[in-house]
Amino acid sequence: MFREKLRREIEIIKNNGLYRFLRKKDDGVLDFSSNDYLCLSKHPEVIEAVKEGLKYGAGSTGSRLTSGNINHQRLEEKIAEFKETERTLVYSSGYATNVGVISALCKKGDLILSDKLNHASIIDGCKLSKADVLIYNHCDVEHLTNLIEENWGKYNNLFIVTDGVFSMDGDIAPLRDLKKIADEFNAILIIDDAHGTGVLGDGRGTLKHFNLKPSDNIVQIGTLSKAIGGLGGFVCGIEEVVEYLINTSRSFIFSTALPPHVVEGCIKAFEIIEKTDIVKKLQKNIKIANKVFKKYEFIKEDNLTPIYPFIFKEKTMEIAEHLIKNNIFCVGIRYPTVPKGLERIRVSINVGHEKEDFELLCERIKEVYSSD
């Protein structure tokens, strides 16, 4: 009975053209799907640090509050220094960080104002928080202000929650404006900088990109699985925020800690970002990609981040399959990850790509797609 019910549901998903399946990325393909923007996951120094970290064992064997607190505080100290903030807390994943931080800090009687295009982990954290949630139009400062003014005085606390860099479009939140609004209305600004850390502001993220300094009303969230090339997530803020989360954040308290060898790799990754020009190399590659992609008319304006949405709508999955058949790994993104009518090939570039790689990608796409 249960099996048949699930089969019917899966068939509906297939009939609607929304069926997902797991695909193995073959060796030797040209990869435009990875979030490993700085290629640190394969950096020799990072790999060596991971090997050295195996002296602690293959796993952490418990949560941070039991047997799992091994070398994690060294990583937290490194991130806090890197992000120029008081303190950092490391979680087992970026998803767990957003869910755990938002659901712990935001409570019944509070109001969350969340950007329309925020990541699913933010949306889930808002749902778990028991706070009221209002969605403001994407990066629309005027709409956000109007919502706050309409609800002023009705709630105990106000939280503005936004991605720093939006994962599907690669655009940047207007943090300078959001910070002004947070200051004016005594709100807390929570920034998920998963795609900004290691990319913008000399690698220190979106806040640094706008020359903004950490403050008491800013909570920064990040991931260790994208530009850092490892696994896990983190939250940065004032001392009291971290102390509170250690005691109340369920996804921190009840999750097994990151494996210690992964922690060592992440520490080394931050050191590489600090001591080399690897972030500048990424920014140089973004400028090269901008020229190529504009030449082929896949973008109209220059990007500041390594995420490029090529909107192909109903042709998206056909193009994605064509690319894979030609040894280019670049996945199609469709509803419900993105709105209907905005299906796209999400192109992620990294420091390892060459101009010729961008040209090849565009040529292969042109074989099945014409903008005319």
From Swiss-Prot:
Binding site for substrate: R20, H119, T337
Domain of life assignment: Archaea
Record-listed N6-(pyridoxal phosphate)lysine modification sites: K226
Keywords, sorted A to Z: Biotin biosynthesis, Pyridoxal phosphate, Transferase
Catalysed reactions, semicolon-separated: 6-carboxyhexanoyl-[ACP] + L-alanine + H(+) = (8S)-8-amino-7-oxononanoate + holo-[ACP] + CO2
Enzyme class: transferase
Enzyme Commission code(s) on record: 2.3.1.47
InterPro entries for the chain: Aminotrans_II_pyridoxalP_BS (IPR001917), Aminotransferase_I/II_large (IPR004839), AON_synthase_class-II (IPR050087), AONS_Archaea/Proteobacteria (IPR004723), PyrdxlP-dep_Trfase (IPR015424), PyrdxlP-dep_Trfase_major (IPR015421), PyrdxlP-dep_Trfase_small (IPR015422)
Molecular functions per Gene Ontology: 8-amino-7-oxononanoate synthase activity; pyridoxal phosphate binding
Pathway participation: Cofactor biosynthesis; biotin biosynthesis
UniProt: pyridoxal 5'-phosphate binding residues: G94, Y95, S167, D192, D193, A194, H195, T223, L224, S225, K226
Keyword set includes Transferase: yes
GO biological process, any: biotin biosynthetic process
Cofactor: pyridoxal 5'-phosphate
NCBIfam families (UniProt xref): bioF
Protein task: Catalyzes the decarboxylative condensation of pimeloyl-[acyl-carrier protein] and L-alanine to produce 8-amino-7-oxononanoate (AON), [acyl-carrier protein], and carbon dioxide.
Family named by the database record: Belongs to the class-II pyridoxal-phosphate-dependent aminotransferase family. BioF subfamily.
Subunit structure: Homodimer.
Protein name: Putative 8-amino-7-oxononanoate synthase
Organism: Methanocaldococcus jannaschii (strain ATCC 43067 / DSM 2661 / JAL-1 / JCM 10045 / NBRC 100440)
